[in-house]
Each structure stands twice: as structure tokens, then as C-alpha cells.
Amino acid sequence: MSMPTIYASPEQFMRDRSEYARKGIARGRSVVVTLFEGGVLFVAENHSPALHKVSEIYDRIGFAAAGRYNEFENLRTAGIRLADVRGFSYDRKDVTGRWLANAYAQTIGSIFSEHQKPFEVEICVAEVGPPRPPRPAGAPPAADGSPGTGDQLYRISYDGSIVEERKFVVMGGVNEPVITALNASFRAGWDLPTALRAAVTALGSTGDNPPRELLPTQLEVAVLDRSAVGRTFRRIPAALLATLLAPPAAADVADAPAAEADPAEPDQG
């Protein structure tokens, strides 16, 4: 007895693959990448110190991802090798965030359409622009915080689609409450502590349920430092993270005794 032939239209086939990939990405924890005055900030909820969801790719380029770890780790290492080869063969300035994002989009898109299983990943390629002159006193920052700075944020989805974001990127998990919270709090040109507190608060948002409180040990945080020369990627350790996350009033109180004990005078001897 022969088995009946089952036909699925190409549209249904692609819808099934998309749903499969989206469900896999949603099972992970969220990641936020946002612009701030000093560069680009990465904040990921990550309870495993041995596994990184945020990392360096090249001099002024960073990488963040959500979804299946082994799949985006393969993409990360491939991106590092590709960037190193291009920088060595041509010039380091030829390694740009736009070029790398396009390379990732082609690879992920091919896997989505040709392989048996699509990658359950969503990635962000971020590039920080060169140092810029200080903004004149009283001058407002740009509406989106990016024009004139050279900062770039690219989101590459599981199907290879690529979108350039102008303010922030949210990936993984149940991200609608996170996006809503960041849309409400985002300010162009905000400083690092303000941006960090807003990102962590957004990651703890759960919609109608009470917000979650995330500890510094549950976070992976890094920046692309605009003022740095050469490699700009810097990880923020848990001790410094706790200080940056402290409310402004608490931080001022903590700094007051140190200021009284160590007045601003030249060292003697």
C-alpha cells in the first residue's frame, strides 16, 4: 500500500520555518543594544558567566545575539575570521559594520532557504563612530542620537532580513514589553548610567505582571567606547555595574565621604 503524497505550498513551507525559528528565539532571554553619548551599549540578561551573548568582532564593531547559543557562536567566530582576513588583505578601515551585516544577512538567508533547519538566531552588528567634538552647551542632541556620529546598529533576523535601527535593538525573549519600556524612556544623547538603568529596567519589564529585578550577576554588559583608540570594546565587570546601576541619589551619597576625605588638591611629594 503506497503512502499518500503530502503537498505543502512554498508559502506554507516558509511560514512553518519562520514560526519554528521565532519560537526558538523567543525561548531565550532578551538582549538590548542602544546608542548613548559615549558610544554603543550592550545589555544582555545572561545567567551563565561562561557563555557570552555579547562580544567583540573588530576594532570598532561589536556583536550581540539571542537564540540558540551554538548557532550564533558559529556566526560570531566566522565573522571574526572574515573581518580579520579583510582587514589584513586590504585595510582595517575596509572592515565596516555595514559590510559585516550584509555578509551575515547573506549567510543566514541562505541557511533559512536552503538548509533542512533554519538558524534560531537573531543578531545585531553594531559599529561605533569616531570621536566627535563636544556638543556646545545648550545645544540639543540629534533626534535619534546617531546622525553625524557614524554609529550604526544593524539587526539581522533568522531569515536573513536586515534592518538598520536608529535608536536601539531588542532581541529574544518576550520582547514587546521591553520595546515598549525603551520607547518610553529613550533619550537621545543620554549618558552611560542613565542608558544602563533604562535598559536593565526594560529587560525586567513583563507587561501586565510585576517587573522583575535583575541583579548585576545576571547581566552581561559591554560598551563600544567612542573615545578609545584602536579596539573600543570594553566589558563592564559586576562590581562597576553595581555602582552604575545605583540610583543617582544613592551614588551621590556614596561618593560624598570620599570627596570629603580626599579634597581636590595637588598631591604632595
UniProtKB/Swiss-Prot annotation:
Range of residues in the leader sequence: none
Primary site of residence: cytoplasm
Keywords: Cytoplasm, Proteasome
Sequence ranges of Pro residues compositional bias: 130-139
Record region (Disordered): 130-150
UniProt KW Cytoplasm keyword: yes
GO biological process terms held by the UniProt record: modification-dependent protein catabolic process; proteasomal protein catabolic process
Subcellular location: Cytoplasm
Annotated metabolic or biological route of this protein: Protein degradation; proteasomal Pup-dependent pathway
Example GO molecular function: threonine-type endopeptidase activity
InterPro entries cross-referenced by the UniProt entry: Ntn_hydrolases_N, Proteasome_alpha-type, Proteasome_asu_bac, Proteasome_sua/b
Inhibition and activation profile: The formation of the proteasomal ATPase ARC-20S proteasome complex, likely via the docking of the C-termini of ARC into the intersubunit pockets in the alpha-rings, may trigger opening of the gate for substrate entry. Interconversion between the open-gate and close-gate conformations leads to a dynamic regulation of the 20S proteasome proteolysis activity.
Keyword field contains Transport: no
Its job: Component of the proteasome core, a large protease complex with broad specificity involved in protein degradation.
Subunit structure, as described in the record: The 20S proteasome core is composed of 14 alpha and 14 beta subunits that assemble into four stacked heptameric rings, resulting in a barrel-shaped structure. The two inner rings, each composed of seven catalytic beta subunits, are sandwiched by two outer rings, each composed of seven alpha subunits. The catalytic chamber with the active sites is on the inside of the barrel. Has a gated structure, the ends of the cylinder being occluded by the N-termini of the alpha-subunits. Is capped by the proteasome-associated ATPase, ARC.
Name of the protein in its database record: Proteasome subunit alpha
Gene (name only): prcA
